[in-house]
Amino acid sequence: MKVNIIKKRSFHSLLPGLLPLFVLAHFAHHLVTALPVPLLPLIRDDFALDYTQSGLVLSAFTLSYGVSQLLGGWLTDRIGPRILITMGICGVGLGGLLVGLSQTYVMMIAFLVLMGLLGGGYHPASPPLVSTLVESKNRGRALGFHLIGGSASFFLAPLIAAAIALVWGWRGSFITLAVPTIVFGIVFYILLGRLADTKQDQDKIISGHNQTPPTVHRLHHLVPFIILSTFTGAVTLATISFIPLFVVDHFGISREVAAALIAVIYFAGLWASPLGGHLSDRLGRVPVLLTVCFMAGPVIYLLNLVPYGLGFGAILLIIGMVLYIPQPASEAYIVGQVSERHRSSILGIYYFSAIGGTGVLTPVIGYLIDHFGFYLTFTLTGAVLVTVTLVCSIFLWRSRD
């Protein structure tokens, strides 16, 4: 293992350099992965799918994407983050291009699986690299700023995809956004090497290792923290997956408007992620996570009660806060609890649990909707979230992190 020394920088000193590049990289990585949910009504009608089959469309990507996080984390700890991040960007672009070229349901499912497998290197590799560039007291802010890129993709991609789909259909949306993603991945690899202005920085980008104790400590807090964070995120994402179908079938909204409406949720990430990082630096990672997780269940239940309009838009915005505020807190908590030589591997487990959990739960929620309707499904989902949060809070309440 290489041991390299890199000077920790202030948060603001990073803004003209590496950090904005990582924000753009995060944006590019999710530009295509953000498409299946808003385009689901169009895909459903094209292949005449029911709710369960629609859930399987989303699971094809999320399950493979989740599993690939494990391999991506393991490889990052051994060959370094630069290659894995680049593969994560170009891989989803290639997979998305093939999805856009698919002509049958089976072909689309196969290429969605491929897209997930090729994209698993980005998330386990990027947070440790970003976190090593700042002092620990600013770690949450840096990670929150980095998350703006992903949030921007999930906010803009539905709007762009809906506009493209009006002319070229859902396949045109995948193809149009996949091509620039691949191009950026290649450019990113070159720029990341050029922006390393010292030999130490270059080694840091290539190897990703530094001097830290080689242990995983405070396991009794780390495990329930990861369980709570990933379970809440997985349930929330699985529920979000059916919101476009919910507004089409429940409120009679057009498919194109439903595709664009999902952007309201992800708009929250543009400011909720930095806010979550800032709050976690000031108040602690655990208090931020517990507060937001206690909100998740009631907010999902309120989808049953709020009529379409400004109130419904407010609920979507709060769901976005529930989704995005805990993310920088969770990443910062894991980075702070785990030695650097194992960080990407543990982050791989974290993202596997969250994304893979979404892949498992999405068809389950689709099945419940098919058999019991939206009202009972949202009610049950909210109750389960509250219960899990209560149980995990028992183990986390006294944590000072």
Language model features with spans:
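Conserved MFS/SLC helix-loop-helix module at the cytosolic interface between two early adjacent transmembrane helices
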Residues: 67-103
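Helix-breaking motifs and short loop linkers at transmembrane-helix boundaries and internal kinks
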Residues: 48, 80, 101-106, 284, ...
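Helix-loop-helix hairpin linking two adjacent transmembrane segments in secondary transporters
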Residues: 146-193
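Extracytoplasmic gate region of multi-pass secondary transporters
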Residues: 36-37, 221-270
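Interfacial helix-cap and linker-helix signal at transmembrane-aqueous boundaries
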Residues: 43-44, 75-76, 160-168, 247-248, ...
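C-terminal transmembrane helical hairpin of 12-TM major facilitator-type secondary transporters
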Residues: 285-330
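Flexible cytoplasmic inter-helical loops of multi-pass small-molecule transporters
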Residues: 190-214
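Cytoplasmic helix-loop-helix junction between adjacent transmembrane helices
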Residues: 111-149
